Design a protein with these regions (language model features):
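Bacterial N-terminal signal peptides that target proteins for export
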Residues: 1-9
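Sec/Tat signal peptide C-region and signal peptidase I cleavage site
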Residues: 8, 17-25
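Early exported N-terminus immediately downstream of N-terminal targeting peptides
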Residues: 25-106
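Juxtamembrane/interface motifs at transmembrane-helix termini
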Residues: 77, 109-114, 182-184
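A mature extracytoplasmic/lumenal domain signature
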Residues: 95, 119-121, 132-136, 147-149, ...
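Surface-exposed, charged secondary-structure patches
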Residues: 101-141, 199
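Short beta-strand edge/turn micro-motifs at domain boundaries
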Residues: 142, 147-175
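Low-complexity, intrinsically disordered terminal/linker segments enriched in charged
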Residues: 164-199
Length: 199
C-alpha cells in the first residue's frame, strides 16, 4: 500500500513539474512576443530612417519569429509534392519575399495602435495559439498568431515559430492556399512563380 502511495505521489510531482514548465514556456513566449512588438514600434517611430531602411529593419526584426518556409510549403498543398528541389527552393524564396513585403508594409502603416495579448495557450502537441487585440481609436482587430515548435532547431530562428496568422478570423495561410489552388487549376506553377516575381 505504501509503495502504491509513493508511486501516486511521484506521478503527481511529475505532473506538477510538467505544468510548471508549460506555464513558464507560455510566459516566456508572451514576453518575447511583446518585446518584438516594442522593438518594431521603436523602428516605426524613428523619423531619422528612410522608408526603405525602416522596412528593412522591420523585416530583420520579425523574420526570426516566422517560419516562412513552412508557410510556403503548406500554401501549395499537394502541388508541393510534385516539385523538384530546385523549384521548391525558388518558390520558397519568392513566397518569403512576398510575405516580408506584406508584413513590412502593414507594420509601416502603424499609427499608435496598441497591441494587447488576450490569451496564450497550447492548442495541441508542439502548437501554441497567441491571441491579441490591435486597439486603435477607430476599431479593435483580433489577431491570432499560431506557433509551432520545429523538431530540429532552425539556424537564426526562434524556438517557437509563427506558421499562420488569423486576422478577424481569416487565416492568411488558408487564404493563400485557396488563391494558389484556384490559380493552379488553369495555369502552371511556373506561371504562378512568374506572378510572384512580378509582384
Amino acid at each position: 500500500m505504501r509503495s502504491v502511495y509513493k508511486k501516486i505521489m511521484m506521478l503527481c510531482a511529475v505532473l506538477l513539474f510538467a505544468q510548471s514548465l508549460s506555464a513558464d514556456e507560455l510566459t516566456d513566449l508572451r514576453e518575447h512576443f511583446l518585446k518584438k512588438i516594442d522593438e518594431v514600434v521603436l523602428i516605426v517611430k524613428d523619423k531619422t530612417l528612410s522608408k526603405d531602411d525602416r522596412n528593412g529593419k522591420i523585416v530583420k526584426s520579425l523574420t526570426p519569429m516566422f517560419d516562412f518556409e513552412l508557410m510556403a510549403k503548406l500554401s501549395l498543398g499537394n502541388t508541393w509534392k510534385e516539385l523538384n528541389q530546385a523549384d521548391r527552393d525558388k518558390f520558397v524564396k519568392l513566397y518569403v519575399e512576398r510575405m516580408k513585403q506584406s508584413y513590412s508594409s502593414k507594420v509601416d502603416a502603424y499609427k499608435n495602435e496598441k497591441v494587447e495579448v488576450t490569451k496564450i495557450e497550447y492548442s495541441k502537441d508542439n502548437r501554441i495559439v497567441l491571441a491579441t487585440d490591435l486597439v486603435s481609436k477607430e476599431e479593435t482587430l483580433d489577431i491570432v498568431y499560431k506557433y509551432h515548435k520545429p523538431k530540429e532547431p532552425i539556424s537564426k530562428k526562434d524556438n517557437w515559430l509563427v506558421y499562420d496568422v488569423e486576422i478577424k478570423g481569416v487565416s492568411i495561410l488558408k487564404a493563400d492556399k485557396a488563391q494558389f489552388k484556384e490559380f493552379l487549376q488553369t495555369k502552371s506553377i511556373y506561371e504562378l512563380m512568374d506572378v510572384l516575381v512580378a509582384k
